[in-house]
Curated annotation (Swiss-Prot):
It holds the Pfam family Trypsin_2. Its main location: membrane. GO terms for biological process: proteolysis. Belongs to the peptidase S1C family. The chain crosses the membrane at residues 8-28, 258-278. This is Uncharacterized protein y4bJ. Residues 399-426 are annotated as: Disordered. GO terms for molecular function: serine-type endopeptidase activity. Residues 404-417 have a biased composition (Polar residues). Keywords: Cell membrane, Membrane, Plasmid, Transmembrane, Transmembrane helix. It is a multi-pass membrane protein. It is found in: Cell membrane. Coiled coil: none annotated. It comes from Sinorhizobium fredii (strain NBRC 101917 / NGR234).
Length: 630
């Protein structure tokens, strides 16, 4: 009897536990359940929260509710809506697809498989806002201030104006001269917001829209500094002006916008894209927060959103307007080298949009006509990034005596540099000229730790070379000699599997011919060890001393920089076999990006005339040098 009672008691405990658990589960996802005629739109799933948020941000303007929810399988779902299924789920999906911009694999959910919401767009406090449409002055009180919004008339032109007073005493009066109107209709706005909590009073954003095609909103920020008030010019922005959000959670709202300098620069407006800009008020200055680590995650989410959009529209990877702004975002995140490779392999070479650079200082924001020069897209993009601060602190030029931290590639455990060799010099390798100003390229490991570097063309005297820059991650070094006017290489960024290639260099110069060594082969793989896409695999024989030398195509263009050969003994230990002619070169696209980042625009390679082997050897010899260092 006692055993039966205990069994019955345990059964009731189990039932109670199940009921409690069910109740808790319902409580957890009650706000996610959709009953009746509504469903969530499931847009994407990922394990990365920042990726999910980046995707969700793309759809905020299209739905009342967008959020990231944890699904029962542990993945993160990007959901939006809810949408009506009154005409059926199929009709609801087709309506979304017909609107455009939605993934083909979206589906509708009643939320039962969703556990909890893990992210929603920050709500923020309501921002007091007043609008002025022209006519009679708008007068109101806010933040202890008496505010009057009106206009200043100059002939038939009218400009929005704002006046601040306290207890009848004038504090400041400002006019938006960049936003003129030719009638009584205006579109001015006043927002009262805390942009700088270090100031005792909130700030005022005074803005006005031009009502012109594609453009523009001009703004002034009024803030108290010391005992008085001052105004700060905001950027002239496409569309509706600054968006406001407290990103870093310090109680001060940041100003979000886009970099209008990218609009019309690389493509017509409709095909232009512009990267995110985050600004923060500090006293009487607007501070660019691109390089502030507190905002790195926000930029990462922005990038995820861009790349998700490109996943839905793969053709935009061929649009120069998109590529330029995407590269700017990648540069902010310190990933410009990898991004340049993508840009150089995909940009639209047939675009007829005029691209120029200015070879002189701007005069009132305009380039003197005589200093304007037409250039290729890569050169125009590099110049634009430099002028607008996107090369940033990740670009670090060094002096010859500097010793940067080595960052080995994934291939290091089983690949061996094709240099250095032992001999009279402490190391030796190959390099090649890349500009008529005497710039040349070699591997970083060839010149690492050198106190003196010399280069020599065949049959000529040695010339001293100085280090301009190094990239240890990609094993590149940029050198320069002062008195060289010889041939220099052209660079091609595309690489095709199986294409014929040649290697020129000065391997084993203490044993082999000192006049250079030329070998032929093919591109055998479009990635290095560990699928490292910075590199390509080649069958052309490589020996110690070839490091830093050119990999050339059938037309005499450089398509890579020889870096290493597979360590045969290490490979034997791993595979039980000795590989033959497994060698590696850094892609031409990575070389091109490295040079652009230091202001050098290589001559673009051509494929107009194929060269036979002797002509290729002569061409390679003309711009290649032996590199020695002590």
């Amino acid at each position: 009897m006692l055993s039966s009672r205990l069994g019955l008691f345990n059964m009731f405990r189990l039932l109670a536990a199940i009921l409690v658990f069910t109740g808790l589960a319902s409580a957890v996802n009650a706000d996610l359940l959709q009953t009746g005629g509504s469903r969530w739109v499931v847009l994407a799933s990922t394990r990365d929260l920042d990726n999910a948020i980046g995707i969700a941000n793309l759809y905020q303007h299209r739905f009342d509710d967008v959020r990231v929810a944890e699904a029962s399988n542990g993945w993160l779902a990007v959901i939006a809506g809810p949408v009506s299924i009154a005409r059926g789920a199929k009709a609801a999906r087709e309506e979304l697809w017909s609107a455009g911009g939605f993934p083909p694999d979206l589906f509708l959910s009643n939320g039962q498989s969703l556990r909890r919401t893990v992210w929603e767009p920050p709500k923020g406090r309501p921002i007091p806002t007043w609008s002025y449409k022209g006519g009679q002055p708008l007068v109101f009180s806010a933040g202890g201030l008496e505010i009057e919004v009106s206009h200043l008339a100059e002939g038939n032109t009218r400009y929005p104006s704002i006046t601040l007073r306290r207890a009848g005493r004038l504090l400041i009066k400002e006019v938006l001269k960049g936003s003129e109107s030719f009638g009584d209709n205006m579109n001015a706005e006043v927002r009262l917001v805390w942009l700088d909590r270090a100031v005792a009073e909130p700030q005022i954003i005074f803005s006005s829209h031009w009502n012109g095609a594609h453009c523009c909103t001009v703004s002034k920020i009024l803030t108290k500094v010391g005992n008085g008030w001052t105004s700060i010019e905001g950027a002239t922005l496409d569309g509706g002006g600054y968006r406001l959000q407290d990103i870093d959670g310090d109680g001060s709202v940041e100003l979000l916008s886009v970099d209008n300098s990218f609009l019309y620069t690389f493509a017509p407006y409709v095909f232009s894209s512009a990267p995110l800009v985050i600004s923060k008020l500090d006293g009487d200055r607007l501070i660019d927060m691109r390089w502030n680590s507190a905002f790195r995650r926000y930029y990462r989410r922005e990038l995820f959103g861009w790349e998700y959009r490109a996943k839905l529209e793969p053709e935009i990877w061929r649009k120069n307007g998109f590529l330029s702004a995407w590269l700017a975002l990648k540069s902010v995140l310190g990933e410009s080298d990898q991004a340049w490779t993508v840009v150089l392999e995909n940009y639209d070479r047939s675009s007829e949009w005029p691209l120029t650079v200015c070879d002189a200082p701007l005069k009132e924001g305009v380039c003197p006509e005589e200093a304007t020069r037409e250039v290729s897209f890569p050169e125009a993009l590099r110049d634009h990034l430099a002028r607008n601060g996107y090369l940033g602190p990740q670009v670090a030029k060094i002096e010859e005596t500097s010793k940067p931290t080595e960052q080995p590639s994934p291939a290091d455990s089983t690949s061996t540099p094709a240099a250095p060799e032992k001999g009279a010099a402490s190391s030796a390798g190959t390099g090649f000229f890349i500009s008529k100003q005497g710039h040349l390229v070699t591997n970083h490991h060839v010149i690492k730790g050198c106190s003196a570097i010399e280069v020599r063309r065949p049959g000529q005297l040695r010339l001293p070379a100085n280090i301009v820059a190094v990239d240890p991650t990609n094993d590149l070094a940029l050198l320069r000699v002062e008195s060289d006017t010889g041939a220099y290489a052209s660079v091609r960024v595309e690489t095709r599997l199986g294409e014929s290639v040649a290697v020129f260099g000065y391997p084993l110069s203490h044993v082999l011919a000192s006049g250079g060594n030329f070998t032929l082969g093919n591109v055998t793989a479009l990635a290095g060890l560990g699928n490292d896409t910075r590199f390509i695999q080649i069958s052309a024989p490589v020996q110690p001393g070839n490091s830093g030398g050119p990999l050339i195509d059938s037309y005499g263009n450089v398509i890579g920089v020889v870096t290493s050969k597979l360590d045969a003994l290490a490979a034997l230990a791993v595979t039980g076999d000795i590989p033959q002619n497994v060698n590696f070169a850094l892609r031409g696209a990575s070389l091109y990006a490295f040079l652009l980042s230091y202001g050098i625009s290589p001559v673009a390679g051509s494929n107009t005339q194929k060269l036979d082997a002797p002509e290729l050897a002569e061409r390679a010899s003309s711009f290649s040098v032996a590199v020695t260092c002590e």
